[in-house]
Amino acid sequence: MTSRKSTKRALITSALAILMCVAMLIGTTFAWFTDTASTGVNKIQAGNLDVKLMYSTDMQTWHEATEQTKLFDDNALWEPGYTQVVYLKVVNAGNLALKYEAGFSKNYTSNRGKNVNGDWYRVDNYLKIGTAETATKFENREAVWSAIAANERTLAKDVMLTDEWITLNPGQESAPFAVAIYMPTSVGNEANASKARPSSVSGLGIEVRATQATVESDSFDNNYDANAATVLNRVEYTDGVH
């Protein structure tokens, strides 16, 4: 009889011990799935590339150009001496260093016409485009022609406006520069449109391409992204209302 009672107590004790172990395991498992870690002062944020193009007509008031901004007049009547100029600067509005280049639009449209001699022509073949850094608005068209004389070239799709990639750190902006398009006074009747078939050009604009620059450092140096794939932010400013 005593032996049976002892066995019964042992079984009950063992069962209680097993239940306690199970309860502890359940509690531990619950803790694994609900445990959290947080910091009160650190914010983890992915770097972003954000390039903006600012434009001005007077070097005083600046506006952000969008894809709908028209920087040049599509309705211009191009003739010898006629000049259009816009002042630009590129801004790094992101939190990563970037490098950019600027070029003339690939997507402008040129329609051929007939000149007063009856010959076919395209007006863009007689237009010049050039750039110049400037801190003030040019006083007259002659000053524009003189400033861009060293780098002007015939208007063409994707003409580069920068000689190389230019690096901007976060929050930094480029020096202001002028982009001018004009018809030289030396052009004659070869681009003098007949009333019936004038040549026209539309969609004149600027394209800015940017990619990440090798500036930020990790625990070793600033070359961690030197072999990263080149991803371009490409923004074109051609259409809309100026």
State the predicted function of each range.
Residues 2-46:
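Membrane engagement elements in two modes
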Residues 2-5, 36-242:
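Surface-exposed, hydrophilic segments of mature proteins
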